[in-house]
């Protein structure tokens, strides 16, 4: 069976979502990468670069530069890691926490308006299908 049409639609759906989401994030005065970091660190305890990398959608090769630019803009501070002297912990500044408190709920509401165009049952089915599909590619030997 040729799954090319599934692959194309999956990619197009992601690209459509990314465009829709990114447009709003930019209207909020952030880049998508900045929003990802702020949304991940917002209302959370400080975390290491490794933890942040695991929880964001940012490639590991880009993360250091992104964080350094956000430190320079006054969005992130580094703290000593009491559990590992070789690493630092990252935390939002009060300035960035205010950005999170305003932008995160606004963006979630923006996305919710789009998802409300589909019935809850259909969204649940789609979520389950995507989880199954992800498992195929993240556990290919299973």
Give the residues covered by each predicted segment.
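Pre-recognition alpha-helix immediately N-terminal to the DNA-recognition helix
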Residues: 20, 36-39, 98
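C-terminal regulatory/oligomerization modules of transcriptional regulators
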Residues: 1, 109, 120-142
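N-terminal leader segment of winged-helix/HTH proteins
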Residues: 1-28
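The alpha-helix within a helix-turn-helix
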Residues: 53
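Residues within helix-turn-helix
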Residues: 49-50, 61, 68, 88
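Short capping segments at the starts of secondary-structure elements
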Residues: 44-48
């Amino acid at each position: 069976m040729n799954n090319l049409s599934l692959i194309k639609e999956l990619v197009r759906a992601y690209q459509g979502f990314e465009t829709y989401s990114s447009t709003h994030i930019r209207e909020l005065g952030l880049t998508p990468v900045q929003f990802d970091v702020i949304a991940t660190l917002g209302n959370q305890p400080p975390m290491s670069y490794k933890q942040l990398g695991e929880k964001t959608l940012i490639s590991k090769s880009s993360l250091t530069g992104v964080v350094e630019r956000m430190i320079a803009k006054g969005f992130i501070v580094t703290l000593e890691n009491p559990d590992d002297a070789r690493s630092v912990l990252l935390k939002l500044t009060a300035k960035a926490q205010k950005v999170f408190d305003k932008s995160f709920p606004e963006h979630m509401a923006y996305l919710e308006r789009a998802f409300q165009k589909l019935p809850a049952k259909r969204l649940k089915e789609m979520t389950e299908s995507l989880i199954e599909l992800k498992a195929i590619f993240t556990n290919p030997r299973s």
